[in-house]
Amino acid sequence: EAIANAPTLRLIGRAGVGVDNIDLDAATNAGILVCNTPGSSTQSVVELTIGHLLASTRHIPTADRDLRSGKWTKKALKGTELSGKRIGFIGFGRIAQGVGRVAKAIGMELHAYDPYLPMEIATEQDCTLHADVNDVFRMCTHIAIHCNLSEETHHLVNAETLSMMPGIGADGNLCGNHLVSCARGGIVNENDVLLALENETLSSC
């Protein structure tokens, strides 16, 4: 409807990577060029992902919320360290590789599922590349989503894959399971994630 009401429109520019919120068929039929801007926010998303990883593992949002409501719940908020844990990437492009470099410096072990990534790139990043996405969920207590939304990745994160996560780090310490998604929403089945949070399959998301 918006495209039909813009007869002089010649270009739609997306400030980001995903274009699933643009009617590509309608744009094509109207002769309108659609472009995205890959790389424009890479570092910002890298830092946001690291922030979410730290916040979830250290219960920072809960601590902030409790303190603002007048509660002092220090003893109830026992966080764990990222060091010694495995992080699994779903998609290992520019953003995931940037997150991986920081995670590696912290002391995390890197794993990834990306069927389109050359093995040598994963090797250069000291990341174990898996052919089966389920292996990443089985091995990792921290999952970071950095892939495009497609028919292949729609609801890739669901009750079945979440139930595979171990909850125990590579260092043998109980740390719970943590999910960070800085990609398109449709990759995650939100109802399954909510249920996983309620039954504590997931510690945070």
Residue ranges and their predicted role:
Residues 9, 83-86, 159, 175-176:
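Phosphate-coordination loops involved in phosphoryl transfer and adenosine-cofactor binding
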Residues 96-97:
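N-terminal Rossmann-fold NAD(P) dinucleotide-binding loop
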